[in-house]
Amino acid sequence: MGCVYRRDILGFHRACPSLMVPATSFTNGIPMSPYPATLNIQVPNALDLILSRRSGSAKAMKGPGPNAEQLQRILAAGVRVPDHGKLTPWRFILFEGEGRTRMGAILAEVASGIPDVSADRMQQEAARFLRAPVVIGVVSRLREHIPTPVWEQELSAGAVCMNILMASHAMGFVANWVTEWCAYHPKVLERIGLRPTERIAGFIYIGHPADVLEDRPRPAVEAITTRF
């Protein structure tokens, strides 16, 4: 079993716990991954990483994207979020390789039903998911008739999206969290396998920036903070 890295007042050091908590299932039947019995990990400069994160436009991305191992780690980071009731109210749809082309065909087909749709629009839709090497669809799947409010379940899905952005940034990629029209069109959602209780929290495009990214102004914290 691999070691975990820990940091305390004495500094950053490595610890190799002798036990792993075995995989279990939550009450909704979703299998859980094994996890260390000892988990107290702090990453040096994590705050600097957060403070340097910014989005890059899906329209200005290039390859390469994350490989299989990197993508697995990005998804693993995605699920490290608050989840009231341990419901796992989210799941992933991966669009890679030819899968992006198939998604484009679906979008073009649905768009063809728009009155007087132009050929340029059809080409745009066919190429929409080709803008980045990898696209992760984050699906919010609501658990109904339970104590956990719907709003909290939706917030958890949003936290998944944010973790994916941060993990991508940590690996040197750029990511863009969008929805666009295809996240709300019932025909598109049906074609990609969403159920009536599911919604797209975001399509996250991941790649490398085609141009140098420049930061943008951020809100002054003092202007949006009150003390009660």
Language-model features: where?
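Conserved hydrophobic/aromatic beta-strand scaffold that supports enzyme active sites
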Residues: 49, 135-139, 203-205, 225
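Small-aliphatic-rich amphipathic alpha-helix that forms the alpha element of a beta-alpha
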Residues: 78, 136, 142-190
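Leucine-biased recognition of intrinsically disordered, low-complexity hydrophobic segments
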Residues: 10-12, 19
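Phosphate/diphosphate-binding glycine-rich loops and adjacent basic-rich segments that engage nucleotide
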Residues: 215-228
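A glycine-rich helix N-cap at a beta->alpha junction
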Residues: 192-216
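N-terminal amphipathic, basic helical "cap/leader" segment at the start of enzyme domains
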Residues: 26-131, 228
